[in-house]
Amino acid sequence: MKAIYTVTLNPAFDLHYRMTHFEAQKENYVDSILCDAGGKGINISRALKVNGTDSTAFVILGDENGAAFEAQLKRDGLHYAPIHTAGRIRENITLHPADSRETRISLDTFRVTPEILHELEKSVLDVCRAGDLLAFAGRNPKGLEKADVIAFLRRLIANGVRVIVDSNSFTPEDLTEIHPWLIKPNEQEIVSFLGTPVENAQDAANAAAELVKRGVAEEVMISLGGDGAVWSDGQDSLILSVPKLAHPVSTIGAGDSTLAGVLHATARGLDRETVLRTAVSFGTAACMTEGTLPPKAEDVKAVFGQTRVL
């Protein structure tokens, strides 16, 4: 099985506040709090671990509260490689009112110097081999030149590492320069990239194929939420449906879990259709857990049996 790595330059403590009702400009009361060490790459590694796949999570940690972050990674049994820097790991706060949609508040993070990025890059390049899988996920922290991050990713790809990029820090031109194995843009990014909205599955499939043809990635996967997902390599496209969830608990982290599913199945050498069915099963099952908690293996299995390639 191929080795899997994740890279998180911008981790966060994910705080989830559940409440009966939220009203702006009023005092609001919280019924329960859930706190997880997160960041997109960490979420991917955690989803993999819960579903029986090991990975190594490279992560930059602020010294002020990094010990608490590491304690949670150890609790979850994750294999991780930390790079320490001055400052404090940020917090992402999500309000979950029972009677309305969730609201997210993101705090700022530490600054990362080029020297810290170089230290992380050396650690990653020392272990990654041709054919290994790596997910670079989350936005770039302050202090880094985007060109330096692009150069890091290009070196990985030049060494034969199959790189997924899931970050809103890059423009279409940046992605064309990086040319990763896979990207998973959201609807806003697609509009930004192509100038046209996605209104249905066929629109999404066309958009995915167009992005590949423009050279932004070898493959493009677009999530349609509860309506499934599409995938294209520019030549072939697949549209997948997923079962409807009567009462989804939280959609936060579902995209990260979807990518975990891609890595989980690809590392095992499974065929394209099975990889994509696994991916949407991970993502859908993640909506059945609180906050950014990973999808349970039994839920993934149940959902997988109900996925379809249309």
Feature roles, as predicted:
Residues 1-23:
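Positively charged, low-complexity intrinsically disordered leader regions
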Residues 29-89, 306:
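Substrate-binding N-lobe of the ribokinase-like
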Residues 49, 157, 267:
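Gly/Ala-rich phosphate-binding loop of Rossmann-like dinucleotide-binding domains
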Residues 95-130:
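Conserved phosphate-binding/catalytic loop of the ribokinase/pfkB sugar-kinase fold
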Residues 104-106, 131-139, 166, 184-187:
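Short beta-strands and strand-loop turn motifs
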Residues 173, 201-310:
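Conserved phosphate-binding/catalytic region of the ribokinase-like
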